[in-house]
């Protein structure tokens, strides 16, 4: 408390709110502890005020946030709450299996505290067991979920292909870290993008979503399950170590305003349903859980015959089914929102990012715009498929800059798909971007004589 008092003086903060908090925490049998803690807090404040050892004080202006009830939340905490909320909204039990791995382990820790909501968690003996359990849970009608980091994704790859072939709604949370191999377990990176989009044998498409802030982890965790169920396909939730361990003030949502998503299982009461028949809108197959009389069907990793789901080695059927799976994932674009542009919708330069780079990018763009530069930014939350308007957004700007904590993986994808001459700003040091790094690159690309920015 003494140290906290010093910090409050340094940052020009009054003590009244902290004193009220202390009084609230130390109630009942602990009430006697409140007074000495408040005294220690004030002693630290007065010590800093009188010792004349500090040459500077700092004033942090009050943040401008919408009204509501807020709490501090980390990315992994928000991720766990988001997956729990998806369970509540869908009225399906959540099953989470994972092998401990930094920086994803906190998701297991948080979900294991939520058993009173019906959450089931398993600390598996290895990565392959964890994804196998999640697939089995999805097959049985639960929300099947597993979590890991890049090395674990490599081990899970074959089983993820099984989920694609069986067309089951499994969600895989990948909290990225520095790689390859063991790499930098406690440092952040964005080097798993190509791995999660393409890293399996065969034509093996999956949906990929990525939060941009710790608080957004909550929303995108729900979105991952919404898309997985709607399209009956595996979905990657792609976070990173910076988001996982970073925190921010998070407005607690009103549960009554969260959109529900209905889940129905065929019962066989209306006759036999072909296991690989397709929904006209989404091309998803029905979610048939085992134990329903009359709905028995084959399941597994061998190619399935269209409609019937029987094992098939027919060459034309294989191409048909391959294209159906690819088109189904590509068609998910109709269920994701268009991306928005921060700033003008046309101009000299667009800074395009994804994941935890949002803060540095937006601050850099705002700084440049305040100096009169024609620059805007956009941030991707959907990485496969891309938002439907991404191509139009890119062509509205003379130049495109793509900052990434890798050696240009999103850059490669948008160059290939949209044929734009984008430029990368790449960093693989285990650290997030500084605002100054992005800002100086903006001035360099706009070829303007601006003094180089230093600092954060």
Language model features with spans:
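Short alpha-helices
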Residues: 1-26, 408-409, 433
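Short glycine-rich or small-residue beta-strand-to-loop segments that form or flank ligand, phosphate
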Residues: 3-5, 94-97, 144-147, 207-210, ...
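Short glycine-rich anion-binding loops that position phosphate/pyrophosphate groups of nucleotides
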Residues: 4-7, 151-152, 176-178, 356-357, ...
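Thiamine diphosphate
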Residues: 17-206, 210-211, 428, 436-439, ...
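A non-catalytic, amphipathic alpha-helix used as a structural packing/dimerization or gating element
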Residues: 21-24, 36-39, 43, 219, ...
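Flexible, low-complexity linker and terminal segments
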Residues: 73-82, 90, 220, 225-456
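Short helix/loop capping segments that flank catalytic or ligand/cofactor-binding pockets
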Residues: 105-107, 156, 181-182, 219, ...
């Amino acid at each position: 408390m003494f140290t906290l008092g010093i910090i409050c003086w340094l940052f020009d903060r009054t003590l009244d709110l902290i004193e009220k908090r202390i009084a609230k925490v130390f109630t009942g049998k602990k009430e006697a502890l409140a007074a000495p803690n408040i005294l220690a807090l004030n002693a630290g404040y007065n010590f800093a005020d009188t010792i004349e050892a500090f040459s500077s004080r700092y004033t942090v202006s009050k943040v401008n946030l919408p009204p509501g009830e807020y709490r501090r939340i980390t990315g992994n905490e928000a991720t766990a709450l988001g997956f729990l909320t998806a369970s509540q909204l869908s009225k399906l039990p959540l099953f989470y299996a994972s092998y401990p791995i930094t920086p994803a382990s906190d998701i297991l820790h948080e979900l294991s505290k939520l058993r009173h909501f019906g959450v089931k968690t398993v600390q598996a003996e290895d990565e392959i067991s964890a994804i196998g359990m999640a697939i089995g849970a999805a097959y049985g009608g639960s929300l099947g979920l597993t979590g890991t980091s890049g090395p674990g994704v490599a081990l899970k790859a074959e089983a993820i292909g099984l989920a694609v072939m069986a067309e089951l709604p499994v969600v895989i949370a990948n909290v990225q870290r520095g790689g390859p191999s063991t790499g930098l377990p406690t440092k952040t990176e964005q080097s798993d993008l190509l791995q999660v989009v393409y890293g399996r044998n065969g034509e093996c498409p999956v949906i990929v979503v990525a939060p941009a802030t710790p608080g957004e982890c909550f929303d995108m965790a729900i979105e991952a399950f919404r898309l997985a169920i709607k399209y009956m396909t595996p979905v990657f939730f792609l976070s990173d170590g910076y988001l996982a361990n970073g925190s921010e003030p998070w407005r607690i949502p009103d549960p009554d305003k969260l959109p529900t998503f209905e889940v129905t299982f065929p019962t066989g009461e209306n006759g036999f349903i072909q296991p690989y028949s397709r929904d006209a809108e989404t091309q998803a197959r029905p979610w048939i859980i085992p134990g329903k009389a009359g709905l028995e069907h084959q399941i597994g990793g061998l190619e399935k015959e269209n409609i019937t789901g029987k094992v098939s080695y027919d060459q034309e059927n294989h191409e048909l089914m391959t294209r159906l799976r690819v088109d189904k994932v590509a068609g998910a674009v109709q269920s994701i929102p268009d991306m928005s542009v921060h700033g003008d919708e046309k101009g000299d330069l667009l800074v395009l990012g994804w994941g935890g780079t949002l803060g540095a990018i937006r601050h850099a763009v705002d700084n440049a715009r305040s100096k009169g530069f024609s620059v805007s930014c956009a941030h991707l939350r959907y990485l496969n498929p891309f938002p439907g308007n991404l191509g139009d957004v890119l062509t509205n700007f003379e130049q495109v800059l793509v900052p990434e904590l890798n050696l240009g993986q999103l850059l490669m994808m948008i160059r290939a798909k949209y044929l734009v001459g984008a430029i990368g700003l790449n960093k693989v040091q285990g650290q997030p971007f500084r605002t100054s790094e992005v800002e100086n690159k903006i001035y360099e690309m706009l070829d303007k004589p601006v003094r180089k920015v230093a600092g954060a």
